[in-house]
């Protein structure tokens, strides 16, 4: 009996080695490192969920085609195990548990949105599973003391602060009147906090502070108030659907405002969807193809834009670019750790200091990227062709800001 037991233990040990992972090691089968991801393929975040998945997949293919990930003198390829989180926080948390407990995944990629990242982070943290995420920008993610969460993007409160600074500058340095309407999700509320901070810093006044409806399909009540009280700047954050709704109703109601600052213009393909109706909208972005960052995998932003467009038949929004950057960060960390031990790779992630086509990546103590500023672009049209032009920061600007926005009667 004892001999049989010893033999079974030996067989199990060999089997575990062949599988290539233990309780502290990444899911490695042969020469494949499997990462886990729950992304929104259905539900209200499905558009950006698709961008996220496409960004991950493009980087996986590029890294694998260029020799993969080198650990211990051997080359490994990336693969991603996907599930649809249905744009639902509870489902996202359940899938994180499933990926870790049932599928044996030891390294995670983030979902789309701050809310879903917030749902998954406690699960990955409890299990000491590193998660490199690209689409959860809420600053509250980085104040929880998480040690296994790393975000390649800039925090949400930084998205539109610079728009208020620009409005004040264009107002001769004097405070401005601000109207704002926000979705009630974690990301948008953090953008709102950034606006409140900017208003306080510049002594500007918030004259409208509205909540967007849950379905993001009507903001006429807010726009009627804007027409009545005439703010200097209108700020809107409601993910892709909110951006499209805002432009549609602003044009229908002929709402004149000197500055319109928004989020998710590129993810919603605003310039393409609404054309000249979207002209002069000022948009926060984590990335733009014209920026000068470089790496050895995608070259620069223009090359990434070309490669992504060839693969998926549409131009990449920043949600795709930052998702690709997450894979480059993982590759770098695995190779510096020279190990599949989760703690060693976690420690390597914490010491990340690199440049990618998307931007510089260096993590603060809370896991946020401290090395990359936001950019602002403005939708500009020549004839019927509309595109995004970077207007801030000045060092990357490809066009001058048009301010104030011409009234609808003159457009």
Each language-model region and where it sits:
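Hydrophobic alpha-helical
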Residues: 114-125, 231-253, 326-327
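Extracellular/periplasmic ligand-binding modules, especially the Venus flytrap/periplasmic-binding
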Residues: 196, 240-243, 292-351
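Extracytoplasmic "Venus flytrap"
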Residues: 29, 33-57, 83-89, 112-113, ...
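Extracellular/periplasmic periplasmic-binding protein-like sensory domains
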Residues: 250-324, 391-411
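Beta-alpha junction/loop-to-helix N-cap segments that form part of ligand/metal-binding clefts
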Residues: 27-28, 34, 47-54, 66-143, ...
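Solvent-exposed, acidic/polar segments of extracytosolic/periplasmic ligand-binding ectodomains
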Residues: 26, 33, 350-411
């Amino acid at each position: 009996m004892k001999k049989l037991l010893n033999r079974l233990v030996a067989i199990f040990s060999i089997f575990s080695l062949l599988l290539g992972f233990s309780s502290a090691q990444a899911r490695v089968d042969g020469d494949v490192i499997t990462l886990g991801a729950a992304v929104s393929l259905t539900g209200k975040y499905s558009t950006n969920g698709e961008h996220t998945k496409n960004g991950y997949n493009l980087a996986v293919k590029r890294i694998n085609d260029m020799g993969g990930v080198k650990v211990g003198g051997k080359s490994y390829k990336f693969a991603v195990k996907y599930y649809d989180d249905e744009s639902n926080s509870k489902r996202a948390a359940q899938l994180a548990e499933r990926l870790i407990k049932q599928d044996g995944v030891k390294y995670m990629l983030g979902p789309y949105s701050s809310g879903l990242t917030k749902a998954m982070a406690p699960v990955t943290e409890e299990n000491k599973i590193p998660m490199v995420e690209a689409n959860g920008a809420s600053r509250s993610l980085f104040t929880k003391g998480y040690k296994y969460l790393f975000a390649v993007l800039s925090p949400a409160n930084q998205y539109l602060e610079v728009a208020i600074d620009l409005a004040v500058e264009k107002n001769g340095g004097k405070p401005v009147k601000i109207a704002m309407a926000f979705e009630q999700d974690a990301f948008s509320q953090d953008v709102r906090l950034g606006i409140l901070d900017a208003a306080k810093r510049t002594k500007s006044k918030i004259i409208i502070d509205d909540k967007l409806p849950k379905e993001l399909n009507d903001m006429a009540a807010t726009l009627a108030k804007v027409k009545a009280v005439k703010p200097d700047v209108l700020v809107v954050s409601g993910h892709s659907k909110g951006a499209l709704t805002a432009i549609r109703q602003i044009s229908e109601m002929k709402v004149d405002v000197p500055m319109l600052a928004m989020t998710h213009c590129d993810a919603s393909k605003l310039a393409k969807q609404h054309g000249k109706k979207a002209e002069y909208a000022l948009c926060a972005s984590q990335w733009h193809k014209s920026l000068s960052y470089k790496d050895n995998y995608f070259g620069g932003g223009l090359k990434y834009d070309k490669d992504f467009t060839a693969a998926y038949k549409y131009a990449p929004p920043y949600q795709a670019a930052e998702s690709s950057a997450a894979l480059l960060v993982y590759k770098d960390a695995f190779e510096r750790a020279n190990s599949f031990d989760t703690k060693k790779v976690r420690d390597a992630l914490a010491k990340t200091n690199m440049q990618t086509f998307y931007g510089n990546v260096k993590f603060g103590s809370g896991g946020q990227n401290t090395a990359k500023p936001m950019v602002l672009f403005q939708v500009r049209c020549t004839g019927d062709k509309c595109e995004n032009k970077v207007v801030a920061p000045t060092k990357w600007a490809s066009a001058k800001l048009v301010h104030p926005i011409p009234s609808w009667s003159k457009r």
